[in-house]
Amino acid sequence: VVNGKPTRTNVGRMVSLKYRNKHI
């Protein structure tokens, strides 16, 4: 559970950064 919670948050943040970079 501990490994799953932070992993999902990290993925979301990485995706957001990549998506924002592509949008710009």
Curated annotation (Swiss-Prot):
GO molecular function, one term: heparin binding
Superkingdom in the source lineage: Eukaryota
Signal sequence annotation: none
Keyword field: Disulfide bond, Growth factor, Heparin-binding
Role this protein plays: HPTA is an acidic heparin-binding growth factor for hepatocytes.
Subunit (UniProt): Heterodimer of a heavy and a light chain linked by disulfide bond(s).
Name of the molecule in the record: Heptapoietin A light chain
Native source species: Oryctolagus cuniculus (Rabbit)
